[in-house]
């Protein structure tokens, strides 16, 4: 028996919106401590890892560890039927091939339930090794989204360079080049407006902007984003979900040989 009740139902809607364009079908793994999802995108370039801890739910019951395969597009369609203030309950029975989403209005004068068919999905659980990162940048998530959007109008890739002076986002395209530098800035009224850089060694890596822009769909989940980088490791773009968990996106860097020759 599985039953989870989330008072802030809009949170689940935002989580789905942030990952559904990257991942089509995925297994949600439920345990007594919370539920998680880990899946590669369809082109096997990016990895999504989601965790929502049980203590963030008003009611959380999971009698035994269970995995439910869901189509995220279909799940998103169902969650869109919930009002932003609705309380969302997820129910599942052992051995059932469906999951039920129940939406209650805050005044409880309207209750809707939607039943969705589950899928059998073969997916290997990829061990994500813990790593020490050379550079970790914490910055306002809206600023990161704006930078990725602006640079994508110029080029296809972004070079993220971290030095003790700051973090630089650069791109080049047919019409020219663009460089945006953020200096460390901790003297702000609100902590979420700060740009904080922890750096052991300078790092400079290149990534596809198409993916970075997709990751920024998680911006509504958190005021801040944390970008962790080390040479030869995928970048980690993390959005913390208040008191509950996180959505993390892992993206392999583009290697030098991926780049076209200048003038080619």
Swiss-Prot record:
Keywords: DNA replication, DNA-binding, Nucleus. One of its GO terms (cellular component) is PCNA complex. SUPFAM superfamilies: DNA clamp (SSF55979). It comes from the Eukaryota. One of its GO terms (biological process) is translesion synthesis. Gene3D superfamilies: 3.70.10.10. Its main location: nucleus. GO terms for molecular function: DNA binding; DNA polymerase processivity factor activity. InterPro entries: DNA_clamp_sf, Pr_cel_nuc_antig, Pr_cel_nuc_antig_C, Pr_cel_nuc_antig_CS, Pr_cel_nuc_antig_N. Residues 61-80 bind DNA. It is found in: Nucleus. Belongs to the PCNA family. This protein is an auxiliary protein of DNA polymerase delta and is involved in the control of eukaryotic DNA replication by increasing the polymerase's processibility during elongation of the leading strand. PANTHER family: PROLIFERATING CELL NUCLEAR ANTIGEN. This is Proliferating cell nuclear antigen. It comes from Populus nigra.
């Amino acid at each position: 028996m599985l039953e989870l009740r989330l008072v802030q139902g809009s949170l689940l809607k935002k989580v789905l919106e942030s990952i559904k364009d990257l991942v089509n079908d995925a297994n949600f793994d439920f345990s007594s401590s919370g539920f998680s999802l880990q899946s590669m995108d369809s082109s096997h370039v990016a990895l999504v890892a989601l965790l929502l801890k049980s203590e963030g739910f008003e009611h959380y019951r999971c009698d035994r560890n269970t995995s439910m395969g869901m189509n995220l597009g279909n799940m998103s369609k169902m969650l869109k039927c919930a009002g932003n203030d609705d309380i969302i309950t997820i129910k599942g029975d052992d051995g059932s091939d469906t999951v039920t989403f129940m939406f209650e209005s805050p005044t409880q004068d309207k209750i809707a339930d939607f039943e969705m068919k589950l899928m059998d999905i073969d997916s290997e659980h990829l061990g994500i090794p813990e790593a020490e990162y050379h550079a970790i940048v914490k910055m306002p998530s809206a600023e990161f989204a704006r930078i990725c959007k602006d640079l994508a109008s110029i080029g296809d890739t972004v070079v993220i360079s971290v030095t003790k002076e700051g973090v630089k986002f650069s791109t080049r395209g047919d019409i020219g080049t663009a460089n945006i530098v953020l200096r460390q800035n901790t003297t702000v009224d609100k902590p979420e407006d700060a740009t904080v850089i922890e750096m052991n060694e300078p790092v400079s890596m290149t990534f596809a902007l198409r993916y970075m822009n997709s990751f920024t769909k998680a911006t509504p989940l958190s005021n801040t984003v944390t970008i962790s980088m080390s040479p030869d490791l995928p970048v980690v773009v993390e959005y913390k979900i208040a008191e509950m968990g996180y959505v993390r996106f892992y993206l392999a860097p583009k290697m030098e040989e991926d780049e076209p020759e200048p003038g080619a």
